[in-house]
Amino acid sequence: MEGVDLLGFLIITLNCNVTMVGKLWFVLTMLLRMLVIVLAGRPVYQDEQERFVCNTLQPGCANVCYDVFSPVSHLRFWLIQGVCVLLPSAVFSVYVLHRGATLAALGPRRCPDPREPASGQRRCPRPFGERGGLQVPDFSAGYIIHLLLRTLLEAAFGALHYFLFGFLAPKKFPCTRPPCTGVVDCYVSRPTEKSLLMLFLWAVSALSFLLGLADLVCSLRRRMRRRPGPPTSPSIRKQSGASGHAEGRRTDEEGGREEEGAPAPPGARAGGEGAGSPRRTSRVSGHTKIPDEDESEVTSSASEKLGRQPRGRPHREAAQDPRGSGSEEQPSAAPSRLAAPPSCSSLQPPDPPASSSGAPHLRARKSEWV
């Protein structure tokens, strides 16, 4: 017990287990009820029977009428009511002090953990707060039980007070009980003062009952807030951790797949090729496309060669041209907006113009071959 003695620890324990409404009720009961009964009620009711006068000389009639008027002395009834209402609170306080002293003697280490009670060990009250390094035990269950008993006792004594005395003290009380002959009128001393005192104690009893209900509601709400959640076993924690890792791994894999399957931007797909570039390379065929100027030069050179050779040879060369066949067989993977140039096999060389100077030359070479 660091810095707090046994008496201080017991006071702190009792203070932490009693609500503010309960403390107000205790002050109300001790000051407005017990002190008023002892200091104001005793002088008013000490000579009550002596001053209870009846208009008859019949022996025993006054005693019988007084017994009917007041079966129980008002002063004694109020004292019994106050003691009975205070009894549950006194029992609860003694229980808290006893348990607090026992826990302080055992020490904080010898008390087992309430969340994991071991077999064969005495279970200690669950701690809910710390004051000066000490764990204050929780006695909220006992406090709620004592509130229920106190409220029931308050209601029972209030009903009994109404059936015995009513709300006001009458000035004249008629009596017809034997041995009285006929109707006998009896007179009460200080009826106004007694009526005021009875009304005051009625108000104190009603206020005590309402405070008991409010204290019960506050105690139930505080206990619900302090109630801990169900303890999680190590196996459940491991399963939850494994499932969390699996979900994280699955999320990472899905993110990687999305990154791999994401389409490239149009600028990266073009690879630096402009729309007006003279040379564009096809990704599938691997051949270099020839611009329009180069195609015209090739066409003119091919026509000149065909003009120098016999007419039957160009057809064989055109049929054996590997470039034309390769371009027709291999599919092109370029975009549709890029138009493929005409192949060389589709070029038909024009017929050479017949000239007068070329005919004698051909006849001379033919004569040499023969």
Swiss-Prot record:
Effect of substituting residue 269 to H: In a colorectal cancer sample; somatic mutation
Source domain of life: Eukaryota
Membrane-crossing segments per the record: 20-40, 77-97, 147-167, 197-217
Sequence ranges on the Extracellular membrane side: 41-76, 168-196
Membrane topology: Multi-pass membrane protein
GO BP terms, alphabetized: cell-cell signaling; regulation of satellite cell activation involved in skeletal muscle regeneration
Biased composition (Low complexity): 331-346
Span of the signal peptide: none
Primary localization class, coarse: membrane
Region (Disordered): 224-370
Membrane topology, Cytoplasmic segments: 1-19, 98-146, 218-370
Listed SMART domains: CNX, Connexin_CCC
UniProt note on tissues of expression: Expressed in pancreas, kidney, skeletal muscle, liver, placenta, and heart.
GO-annotated molecular function: gap junction channel activity
A Pfam family hit: Connexin
Ranges of Basic and acidic residues composition bias in the record: 246-260
InterPro entries: Connexin, Connexin_CCC, Connexin_CS, Connexin_N, Connexin_N_sf
Subcellular location: Cell membrane; Cell junction, Gap junction
A GO cellular component annotation in the UniProt record: connexin complex
Gene3D superfamilies: Gap junction channel protein cysteine-rich domain
Keywords linked to the UniProt accession: Cell junction, Cell membrane, Gap junction, Membrane, Transmembrane, Transmembrane helix
Family recorded in the similarity comment: Belongs to the connexin family. Delta-type subfamily.
Subunit description: A connexon is composed of a hexamer of connexins.
Function: One gap junction consists of a cluster of closely packed pairs of transmembrane channels, the connexons, through which materials of low MW diffuse from one cell to a neighboring cell.
Name of this chain's protein: Gap junction delta-4 protein
Organism of this sequence: Homo sapiens
Gene: GJD4
